Curated annotation (Swiss-Prot):
Residues 414-424 have a biased composition (Basic and acidic residues). GO terms for cellular component: nucleus; origin recognition complex. GO terms for biological process: DNA replication. This is Origin of replication complex subunit 5. ATP binds at G83, G84, A85, S86, T87, G88, K89, T90. Keywords: ATP-binding, DNA replication, Nucleotide-binding, Nucleus. A motif (Nuclear localization signal) lies at residues 129-136. It comes from Arabidopsis thaliana (Mouse-ear cress). Belongs to the ORC5 family. Coiled coil: none annotated. Component of the origin recognition complex (ORC) that binds origins of replication. DNA-binding is ATP-dependent. The specific DNA sequences that define origins of replication have not been identified yet. ORC is required to assemble the pre-replication complex necessary to initiate DNA replication. One of its GO terms (molecular function) is ATP binding. Component of the origin recognition complex (ORC) composed of at least ORC1 (ORC1A or ORC1B), ORC2, ORC3, ORC4, ORC5 and ORC6. ORC is regulated in a cell-cycle and development dependent manner. It is sequentially assembled at the exit from anaphase of mitosis and disassembled as cells enter S phase. Interacts directly with ORC1A, ORC1B, ORC2, ORC3, ORC4 and ORC6.
Length: 534
């Protein structure tokens, strides 16, 4: 989000998306002289019921945040809002401040990507300075050093607080019905976890965490928003630790309420969510990713309908699901794509993307185009089999005969068995890839790696050279746990929580069948022989 002084007064910070839009510089905006009202939304405050309805699943976090801020003009300790991406942290903070009509200064460490830009953004807002052509789009103060920033910010905040005190006394007599702004100002620093990647980022973080202690201004409230927990920033510098407030991932029911909001036909969309929400929630719970995918799928879901205002019955739901089913697997594989981290660079991101499934470039990906050790390949296949095969079939799958007996007598499928198979396929799509404990992964790995070792051994005997095989066989299990960690880092595996009874971590494979087949082909491993087909 850009610094606050660059947004218009009318649409001031109404949403994160509107705040990220660059506003054209026009004469009326440039002629506007910023006032103390520019430190608020510049709109009517909203009720607490409106805030709660706008953020399903965030009721407890909203009330906790209001409680931590305290009543009007109450000094507050620094607060750290933390949680994963797309959990509503920034939006909730801004809308609560709009509800309370509290003045604040907002700066994001994503757009303010170095200390100078961050310091000047905060000072510009505190000094009520707006960049425009009249001042050559320059900042009110040039500031590079933390020591200069402290002195300049103290002066700016002192002036703001004096103005708030006089405004508060005037508003009581002139506008008794309007919610007062109070005499405090809040400094909101968003995406503070990105500072860790800055040059001398550790020093800047320690400085920002100690800012409340250094300034010693009870009229200042500091709110830090982070994607990482407070433990990451722990230091023994002696500053006041911020009060943590955690925003967890949205539950499946929360996501349902979010996507049902503002839908003209809630019953039709609810039937659509019954089909797609559960499998996609196993992959991601980020609202923006799901929203993009669901928009495409819902249009496909509604194609057979002439009237979008109808309430579908059970028979119609089945027909709509059958129409949508071929696209679900493709969209799931698209979300399985491994996106590179911001600091990983373009090359790594392109390599991950090439390793992912895509129907458009399937022919180009017939050969595995990235390097992976033999043990990692077998581990990848083991995880794929553990996610796709029922655990109850492990004994028969990996017996001494080597996989399922494909020579069983085939019987003519009855209508009832076909119906059961259809239901099983539907359930499999809705469930998505299954989770498994580490012990099961290692057991499958040991079985299929021994099959691979046998084939390697036969080739070595023909060549009368067993040195390479012996070396490979001895080293195959040496780095298995390290490979599990590496596959998790690359998002080929994800941790799906721990079992409450066993207390052990469970994993889930994010690999598509096409990629698994390519890996198996590079090892000359008969994957289809061990893959359970319903």
């Amino acid at each position: 989000m850009p610094p606050k002084e660059e947004s218009s007064k009318v649409t001031r910070r109404s949403t994160r998306s509107s705040a990220s839009v660059t506003v054209e510089n026009s004469e009326p905006i440039e002629s506007h002289t910023p006032t103390i009202d520019d430190l608020t939304f510049g709109e009517e405050s909203i009720t607490i019921d409106a805030v709660l309805s706008n953020f399903p699943g965030r009721r407890s976090q909203i009330f906790d945040f209001i409680r931590l801020m305290g009543p009007l003009d109450c000094p507050t300790l620094p607060i750290m809002i933390y949680g994963g991406a797309s959990t509503g942290k920034t939006s909730v903070v801004l809308q609560v401040l709009r509800h309370l009509n509290r003045p604040f200064v907002y700066s994001s460490c994503r757009t303010c990507y170095n200390p100078r830009i961050l310091f000047e953004s905060i000072l510009n807002q505190s000094l009520l300075h707006r960049k425009c052509s009249l001042n050559g789009y320059s900042s009110a103060k040039r500031c590079d050093k933390p020591s200069d920033f402290v002195n300049l910010l103290r002066e700016a905040l002192s002036s703001v607080i004096k103005t708030l005190e006089s405004t508060s006394e005037t508003s009581r007599s002139d506008k008794p019905d309007e919610k007062p702004m109070g005499k405090m100002v809040y400094l909101i620093l968003d995406n503070v976890d990105l500072i860790r990647d800055w040059d001398k980022g550790t020093i800047i973080l320690q400085f920002l965490f100690s800012l409340y202690t250094v300034l010693k201004m009870p009229q200042l409230g500091i709110i830090l928003i982070s994607g990482l927990p407070p433990d990451v920033y722990y230091s023994n510098m002696g500053y006041t630790d911020p009060i943590p407030l955690y925003f967890p991932e949205y539950s499946e029911e929360d996501l349902r309420q979010i996507f049902l909001r503002n839908q003209p036909n809630r019953k039709l969309y609810s039937a659509f969510l019954d089909v797609v929400l559960k499998p996609f929630c196993r992959v991601t719970r980020r609202v923006e990713e799901l929203s993009t995918t669901f928009s495409l799928l819902f249009r496909k879901f509604c194609e057979p309908l002439d009237d979008l205002g109808i309430s579908p019955n059970e028979d119609m739901k089945r027909r709509l699901y059958s129409h949508l089913k071929p696209l679900i697997a493709h969209c799931l594989n698209e979300i399985f794509r491994v996106s590179s981290h911001p600091h990983d660079g373009e090359t790594r991101g392109e390599r991950r993307q090439k390793a992912s499934y895509s129907s458009e470039n399937r022919e180009e990906l017939e050969i595995l185009d990235f390097h992976m050790s033999t043990s990692a390949k077998f581990l990848l296949l083991s995880a794929f089999l553990a996610s796709r095969n029922p655990a109850t079939l492990d004994a028969s799958m990996f017996d001494s005969t080597g996989g399922m007996d494909n020579r069983k007598r085939k019987r003519k499928a009855s209508e009832k068995s076909m119906e059961k198979k259809e239901i099983a396929e539907q359930e499999a799509v809705m469930k998505g890839p299954g989770s498994f404990p580490l012990e099961r992964l290692l057991a499958i790995f040991q079985c299929i790696a021994s099959v691979g070792d046998s084939s390697f051994g036969e080739e070595d005997e023909e060549e009368e050279n067993t040195t390479g095989y012996d070396k490979e066989n001895n080293n195959l299990m040496s780095d298995i746990l390290l490979q599990v960690s590496s596959l998790c880092d690359a998002n080929f595996l994800i941790k799906s929580g721990s079992c409450p009874l066993e207390g052990s971590i469970r994993y889930r494979s994010m690999v598509s069948e096409d990629l698994a087949q390519k890996v198996a082909k590079s090892l000359s491993f008969p994957l289809s022989k061990y893959l359970y087909r319903r």
